Amino acid sequence: MTVTPQRRTELLRGVLDLCLLAVVLDEPAYGYEMTRRLRERGLSTVGEGSIYPLLGRLERDGLVATHREASEGGPPRKYYRASPSGRSALAEGVRAWREVRGEVDSVLATIEAGVA
């Protein structure tokens, strides 16, 4: 069975904020650049429209710092970078993700042979 883009989005919903923090951990980026970085790392179905609500929440929660820079031929771009709180949240989130992923893998491994 092929994973549909909709199902992939549902599965990513809980961890996309971690992925966004990861791609702006060391170098700031604006929205389009962030989606490009995510795609380069394998998240091909993530679009700009799906990240902006998350970026707004990350900014409100103090997990990203922002600044604006002029762009060629357009309005200024808003750049995002992980704040110190964002770095801590990312580290904690990665630990939690690995723990949950391990638990889910354990459950699915028990039935994997019978499903394949």
Q: Model segments located where?
A:
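Amphipathic alpha-helical dimerization/coiled-coil segments
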Residues: 4, 88-116
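Beta-hairpin "wing" of winged helix-turn-helix
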Residues: 61-73, 81
